[in-house]
């Protein structure tokens, strides 16, 4: 992912047509093979772990009313099941937004996306009743689903046509180039928050999630930490893009 976004694009821009015609049909199918199957493997194993450890596990990660509440006999909390569905269906709203005219206004689309993410996390905590680790990993699952979708249903189909055009000595469709580039960039931006959700699963109850030394941070507002990490992760990627454009070859 980082090779494509921080290195490959800049190197490709220095190639002439004949070089691209020789290199791209040999290089890109090979790199994209490992790229897309790595994405598929990560998503499938992640979903399996989510089901086994969280949905079916006995560690108490899910709220008591995930199924019938044994304490009072009430039925399951439908907010939980609605939010689980949204976790894996939000990709279609994301795809709709970034196929619409709204995508041309990057700042507005980014703000709307962040607000929707905030609403999702807030609802997971206060309506579905998820604890930190549970809403943390479900946000990761949502990002991971979007990233895998981008790889298999947007980037790879577009790249197949782009590579074929270059191989035939033709100019690739500009819309396809833009689509593949945009979705790959989105995956790069989502990757940092996703990594956070995976590596901080054992930190529930520490200072970063409430109950530690950070003033005013408690279990009531620890969902804000996750949103700060999302924003910080996006900013880090933004700075990495700027840095990658300044690194030159010999």
Which residues does each predicted region cover?
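Polytopic transmembrane helical bundles with strong interfacial aromatic enrichment
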Residues: 1-250
């Amino acid at each position: 992912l980082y090779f494509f976004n921080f290195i490959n694009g800049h190197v490709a821009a220095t190639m002439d047509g004949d070089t691209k015609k020789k290199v791209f049909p040999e290089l890109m199918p090979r790199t994209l093979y490992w790229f897309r199957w790595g994405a598929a493997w990560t998503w499938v194993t992640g979903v399996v772990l989510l089901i086994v450890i969280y949905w079916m596990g006995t560690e108490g990660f899910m709220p008591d009313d995930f199924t019938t509440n044994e304490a009072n006999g009430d039925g399951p909390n439908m907010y939980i099941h609605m939010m689980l569905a949204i976790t894996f269906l939000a990709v279609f709203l994301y795809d709709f937004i970034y196929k619409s005219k709204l995508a041309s206004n990057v700042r507005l689309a980014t703000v709307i996306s962040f607000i929707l993410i905030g609403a999702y996390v807030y609802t997971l905590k206060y309506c579905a009743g998820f604890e930190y680790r549970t809403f943390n990993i479900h946000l990761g699952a949502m990002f991971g689903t979007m990233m895998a979708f981008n790889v298999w249903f947007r980037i790879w189909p577009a790249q197949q046509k782009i590579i074929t055009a270059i191989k035939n000595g033709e100019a690739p469709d500009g819309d396809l180039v833009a689509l593949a580039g945009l979705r790959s960039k989105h995956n790069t931006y989502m990757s940092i928050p996703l990594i956070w959700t995976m590596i901080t699963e054992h930190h529930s109850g520490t200072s970063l999630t409430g109950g530690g030394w950070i003033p005013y941070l408690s279990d009531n507002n620890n969902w804000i930490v996750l949103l700060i990490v999302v924003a910080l992760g996006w900013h880090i990627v933004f700075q990495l893009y700027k840095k990658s454009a300044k690194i030159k070859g010999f």
